[in-house]
């Protein structure tokens, strides 16, 4: 994993003039929110699960190893259907009970009602936004979900100040298509080559943004060194071989290292 020595500095010919962020598991702790809700929804078929079982169950849902979210991005599933497929796969490892019909419909209703109650911004988000504003650096978000859903998520997480938001329905494509990153740069008024894009998915966020002409930075909060299935995008590679290295940071405070020095 690249370290600080691999990161650009303010001495570069083209200093950063704008910053874009992924949302899920970058600005908003979606994995924790989903974990809370998965265990909160009453499900008699899972009443026998112990603590370790719940950890594995949640991981099967949040990491989406069968890539059902990609099928949603490709138009093969609705947003609700990809959730049903993911929870069905997770449940299959712990119960033979079917997850169909009214059972699935009731689960989706409960999930949709409960999830927004748990949207929280990471502790390092607001301090970074304060610092960007103090420096006059514009910022925004580019997400692999629809605009209105993500707008509501940001607002619920207390991030109303993020005014620029590009969703997959904004330009009709998903990450890693170059158009979605470039639209974000356009909306914040920054040249792509001078725009930092920060996200938790190494391939879809950091490499995708870099390939679109931005400065891609991988946010690896856990140090796990794995690609996130939750925000995997259509066209993303599944393996690590042959993937170019990109700058890596462990928290958002490190974004300031990429910005011009305050004089």
Residue ranges of model-derived segments:
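Asp-based, Mg2+/Mn2+-dependent phosphohydrolase catalytic module
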Residues: 1-19, 31-32, 126, 130-133, ...
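A metal-dependent, Asp-based hydrolase signature
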Residues: 63-110
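Short, surface-exposed acidic
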Residues: 46-59, 93-109, 161-162
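A generic alpha-helix surface/boundary motif
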Residues: 36, 40, 81-88, 148, ...
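A ubiquitous structural signal for well-ordered alpha-helices
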Residues: 37, 41, 57-60, 64, ...
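Active-site neighborhood of HAD-like aspartate-dependent phosphohydrolases
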Residues: 2-63
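Surface-exposed cleft-lining segments at the edges of enzyme active sites
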Residues: 111-117
């Amino acid at each position: 994993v690249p370290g600080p020595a691999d990161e650009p500095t303010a001495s570069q010919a083209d200093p950063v003039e704008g910053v874009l962020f992924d949302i899920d598991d970058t600005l908003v702790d979606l994995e924790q929110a989903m974990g809370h809700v998965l265990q909160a929804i009453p499900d008699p078929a899972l009443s026998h699960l112990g603590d370790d079982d719940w950890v594995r169950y949640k991981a099967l849902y949040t990491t989406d190893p069968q890539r059902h979210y990609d099928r949603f991005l490709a138009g093969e599933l609705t947003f609700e259907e990809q959730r049903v497929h993911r929870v069905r796969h997770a449940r299959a490892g712990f119960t033979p009970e079917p997850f169909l019909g009214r059972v699935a419909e009731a689960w989706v209703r409960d999930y949709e009602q409960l999830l927004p109650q748990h949207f929280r911004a990471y502790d390092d988000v607001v301090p970074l936004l304060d610092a960007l504003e103090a420096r006059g650096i514009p910022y925004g978000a580019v997400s692999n979900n629809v605009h209105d859903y993500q707008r509501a998520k940001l607002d619920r997480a207390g991030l109303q100040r993020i005014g620029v938001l590009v969703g997959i329905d904004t330009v009709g494509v998903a990450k890693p298509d170059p158009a979605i990153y470039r639209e974000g740069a356009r909306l914040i008024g920054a040249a792509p080559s001078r725009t930092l894009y920060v996200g938790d998915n190494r391939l879809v966020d950091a490499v995708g943004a870099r390939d679109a002409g931005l400065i891609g930075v991988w946010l690896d909060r856990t140090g796990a060194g794995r690609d996130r299935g939750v925000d995997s995008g259509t066209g993303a590679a599944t393996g690590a071989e042959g993937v170019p290295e990109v700058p890596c940071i462990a928290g958002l405070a490190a974004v300031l290292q990429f910005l011009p020095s305050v004089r």
